[in-house]
UniProtKB/Swiss-Prot annotation:
It comes from Drosophila melanogaster (Fruit fly). Its EC number is 2.4.2.7. It holds the Pfam family Pribosyltran. CDD domains: PRTases_typeI. This is Adenine phosphoribosyltransferase. The gene is Aprt. Homodimer. It catalyses: AMP + diphosphate = 5-phospho-alpha-D-ribose 1-diphosphate + adenine. SUPFAM superfamilies: PRTase-like. Catalyzes a salvage reaction resulting in the formation of AMP, that is energically less costly than de novo synthesis. The lineage of its organism: Eukaryota, Metazoa, Ecdysozoa, Arthropoda, Hexapoda. It is found in: Cytoplasm.
Length: 182
């Protein structure tokens, strides 16, 4: 039997696999790339463990895990299957079949639209929203609004990485947790 690995050691390992690309996508930006962690099987398992353990402790009442288009999808299914919960996607406009609700939100370079299938979340269901990154908070604010439109209740927003200097957390109501802060 191998020794148990602490959450801190798991997190350090995941951090070591996150790529850094200066001046991408434009001059002056340091892009942190989660895909480096996802291509490493051990880092991927550790990341799943950290997210699942956090929800077990912080939001045990959760019934649905929602992932945001597109990197949030990489995590919500992993979490939901491990916890035996439902999962639902929030997608960009025009990507979901059936009846949808939508909300527009501001990006630093314009406006975009998120959509959610009306049947994905039942009124009163408790939801954890998962994404890879919290920057300005615009996408998580929009997701929370969208979930509210179908009667869901966001109990927590959970992200892998947070860019603290952009202060996106200040725009969000309710619990917010990030595994890694830059």
């Amino acid at each position: 039997m191998s020794p148990s690995i602490s959450a801190e050691d798991k997190l350090d390992y995941v951090k070591s696999k996150i790529g850094e690309y200066p001046n991408f996508p434009k001059e002056g930006i340091l892009f942190r790339d989660i895909f480096g962690a996802l291509t490493d099987p051990k880092a991927c398992v550790y990341l799943r463990d950290l997210l699942v353990d956090h929800i077990r402790e912080s939001a045990p009442e959760a019934e649905v895990i929602v992932g945001l288009d597109s990197r949030g999808f990489l995590f919500n299914l992993l979490i939901a299957t491990e916890l035996g919960l439902g999962c639902a996607p929030i997608r960009k406009k025009g990507k979901l079949a059936g009846e949808v609700v939508s909300v527009e939100y501001k990006l630093e370079y314009g406006i975009d639209t998120f959509e959610l299938q009306k049947s994905a979340i039942k009124p009163g269901q408790k939801v954890v929203v998962v994404d890879d990154l919290l920057a300005t908070g615009g996408s998580l604010v929009a997701a929370t609004e969208l979930i509210g439109k179908v009667g869901g209740v966001v109990v927590e927003s959970l992200v892998v990485m947070e860019l603290v200097g952009l202060e996106g957390r200040k725009r969000l109501d309710g619990k917010v947790h990030s595994l890694i802060k830059y």
